[in-house]
């Protein structure tokens, strides 16, 4: 695994990282809730992954932990945002500056804010 020195990790104990994963420069892992990053996954520069939110119906605005899972071989491209409770499927791609607020299917490429499906990711063999 490779984690750049400029990466910000809120709570290291709530972070699981698979073999050969890369966490790029200026990535923010706001992991009050658990964040799991799969093997060979890439989190590119400036991405922000957030595993908590607030209960907007609670008068005290209580914190709610919502774990984030990023599958093996997934890529979260530059300056993207992955929101609380989101699962990024195996091999999925979230394009640059994309914002994921719901589950992204495996081996599918997404882009935009909110992220929308662009096409199936096909690997060269």
Identify the meaning behind each predicted range:
Residues 78-102:
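Beta-rich strand-turn-strand
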Residues 5-17, 22-87, 108, 113-114, ...:
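Flexible, glycine/small-residue-enriched loop-and-beta-strand segment within the central core
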């Amino acid at each position: 695994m490779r984690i750049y020195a400029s990466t910000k990790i809120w709570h290291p104990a709530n972070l699981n990282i698979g073999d050969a994963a890369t966490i790029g420069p200026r990535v923010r892992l706001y992991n009050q809730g658990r964040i799991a990053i799969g093997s060979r996954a890439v989190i590119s520069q400036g991405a922000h992954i957030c595993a908590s939110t607030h209960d907007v119906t609670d008068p005290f605005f209580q914190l709610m932990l919502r774990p984030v899972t990023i599958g093996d071989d997934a890529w979260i491209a530059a300056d993207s945002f992955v929101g609380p409770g989101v699962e990024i499927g195996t091999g999925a791609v979230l394009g640059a500056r994309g914002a994921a607020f719901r589950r992204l299917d495996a081996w599918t490429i997404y882009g935009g804010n909110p992220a929308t499906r662009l096409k199936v990711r096909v690997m060269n063999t």
